[in-house]
């Protein structure tokens, strides 16, 4: 009987797609004739929004990879990709929902975004790039801690 009273929890991927992809090689074709020592930087951003259909959410994970030559600081390439997922999420309270959107959903999207980035770099004529796994739970906990610190500092003023 206790099982019947438990709310149904559902976290399902309904659709995955590349929402945006941009590849820039500003110094082509000369860049392919130079001996370069690339320094790679990775930028990560994500956002989510509730969709019109009940319990459906859209999560966008944006990765920006910039390769600059370590000696000249000139941009070798810049790749931006937005991997998007539509998720159906049922039976979670607000705190659990935020955790699911910011951790679970981004963790699902990241391997797809990573593959899109690596493929785009290879298709642009450069050696493939392996992006390390990311602990989105740790990033989310850092974000919550920063928000708490900001709120605490705002309350002291």
UniProtKB/Swiss-Prot annotation:
Keywords: Chaperone, Cytoplasm, Protein transport, Translocation, Transport. GO terms for molecular function: unfolded protein binding. InterPro entries: SecB, SecB-like_sf. This is Protein-export protein SecB. GO terms for cellular component: cytoplasm. SUPFAM superfamilies: SecB-like. Belongs to the SecB family. It is found in: Cytoplasm. The gene is secB. It comes from the Bacteria. One of the proteins required for the normal export of preproteins out of the cell cytoplasm. It is a molecular chaperone that binds to a subset of precursor proteins, maintaining them in a translocation-competent state. It also specifically binds to its receptor SecA. Its main location: cytoplasm. GO terms for biological process: protein folding; protein tetramerization; protein transport. Homotetramer, a dimer of dimers. One homotetramer interacts with 1 SecA dimer.
């Amino acid at each position: 009987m206790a099982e019947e009273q438990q709310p149904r929890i559902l976290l399902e991927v309904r659709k995955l797609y590349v929402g945006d992809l941009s590849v820039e090689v500003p110094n082509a074709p000369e860049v392919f004739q130079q001996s370069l020592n690339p320094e790679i930087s990775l930028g990560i951003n994500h956002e989510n929004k509730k969709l019109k259909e009940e319990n459906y959410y859209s999560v966008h994970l944006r990765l920006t990879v910039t390769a600059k030559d370590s000696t000249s600081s000139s941009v070798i390439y810049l790749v931006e990709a937005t991997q998007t997922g539509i998720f159906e999420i049922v039976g979670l309270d607000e705190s659990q929902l935020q955790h699911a959107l910011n951790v679970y959903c981004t963790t699902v999207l990241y391997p797809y975004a990573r593959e899109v980035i690596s493929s785009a770099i290879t298709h642009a004529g450069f050696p493939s790039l392996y992006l390390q796994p990311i602990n989105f739970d740790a990033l989310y906990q850092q974000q919550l801690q920063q928000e708490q610190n900001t709120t605490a500092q705002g309350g002291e003023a």
